[in-house]
Amino acid sequence: MSAAEGPLVVGVDTSTQSTKALVVDVATGRVVASGQAPHTVTSGAGRESDPRQWWDALCEALRQCGEAAHEAAAVSIGGQQHGLVTLDGHGEPVRPALLWNDVRSAPQGHRLIEELGGAKFWAERTGSVPAASFTVTKWAWLAEHEPEAVRATRAVRLPHDYLTERLTGQGTTDRGDASGTGWWASGTEAYDEEILGHVGLDPALLPRVVRPGEVAGTVRDSHELPFSKGTLVACGTGDNAAAALGLGVRPGTPVMSLGTSGTVYAVTQRRPADPTGTVAGFADARGDWLPLACTLNCTLAVDRVAALLGLDREAVEPGHGVTLLPFLDGERTPNLPRSSGLLHGLRHDTTGGQLLQAAYDGAVYSLLAALDLVLDEDADPSAPLLLIGGGARGTAWQQTVRRLSGRAVQVPRAAELVALGAAAQAAGLLTGEDPAAVARRWETAAGPVLEAVERDEETLDRLAGVLSDAAPLLERGTGAG
């Protein structure tokens, strides 16, 4: 390892499937060491994971970082949002954590919306209408199905909170991750006692919300990690807010993440409240807001279409007239949970490459429609769209986003943006800088800019028309008679 120019910090991304750790030079942003270890997630009706796995994975990831991790002066945890972690009086998990993608609590979500003033109430109070991913619905599900677990619970945490608490011995969270629970009021930036009372959750069980820039604590003696006692621990945040930090995005800069699911978001200084539920009104990790919309069908759905056609994912061909809505897992944006994929306009001369391009078009159309709802009216339409995630380096994805958005597209070279965002937050504790400014100094968003091209209005109009005409069929789903 070459000598670092400044102090070292550790940024962690504890995601659904694995924990990744980066040791970063504060002066330059250079990653001097990294490590990664997997988690397991249950399959079947629910999606659960033992939080103790996350700790073991963190220990292993840091072990892989070697001596560099021992030299770190500060650490921060970024993590998967929404998960419900229930702990007993000794800090041990009462049961496995209910993860963000465990949708068994959908009925409880619908009931909570009805019981507490409707969607408008929730949007105005918490910034979001609670979907099955939100923690409040998971607590309601647990109270209904496993009341003995609720009775045994002495602390309620989010995934990143659990790891932070094991480092410091103190129960803390941050505004970014708290805003995805459904029991944090975005208007007052405090826990909502009415909502907590309605779901029977004692606020004393919840962690203290640490303000941006505040130290969450220091590393305590009794731990298994390579940090020295007294190493600073930042408050951490949820994965989307951490990625926004990792990019150093300024208000109004649009971000599109292409993964198994697709995500669009932008930082804004206006508190969002969308009663349709399309846009989640999250807080960011700095003091601003992070309106975000998500689609369920993105890279995995398009790859499935390519596999069915026997084509490489880049083997697209231009073609006009065929439309494919790749809603293979139902869809959240637009809100069509019972939908399936829909193909329209197939003719004798339609090629496999044209069908594959139509799948890309359908996936990107949904994301761009959501982006229009996320951006402020005064956002700069000429600002490049930051394209991140696993699909961002694919030529077919890049060209489809350019053609349908009419925007310039920038593809950051930096990877592991959640861990980099956590590292920037940790660095801010040492230097006093805004973490987003740290990331900009590190030039994490630097990458090739693809110039804007004329927007393909014909394809956009065709997609909008097919979606509108087919909405009753898509809403009914394949199981209805």
UniProtKB/Swiss-Prot annotation:
It is an enzyme of class 2 (transferase). Keywords: ATP-binding, Carbohydrate metabolism, Kinase, Nucleotide-binding, Transferase, Xylose metabolism. The active site is at residue 239. It comes from the Bacteria. It catalyses: D-xylulose + ATP = D-xylulose 5-phosphate + ADP + H(+). PROSITE patterns: FGGY_KINASES_1, FGGY_KINASES_2. GO terms for biological process: D-xylose metabolic process; xylulose catabolic process. The keyword ATP-binding applies. It holds the Pfam family FGGY_C. GO terms for molecular function: ATP binding; D-xylulokinase activity. The record marks 13 as: Important for activity. InterPro entries: ATPase_NBD, Carb_kinase_FGGY, Carb_kinase_FGGY_CS, FGGY_C, FGGY_Carb_Kinase, FGGY_N, Xylulokinase. Its EC number is 2.7.1.17. Substrate binds at residues 81-82. Catalyzes the phosphorylation of D-xylulose to D-xylulose 5-phosphate. NCBIfam families: XylB. This is Xylulose kinase. It comes from Streptomyces rubiginosus. The gene is xylB.
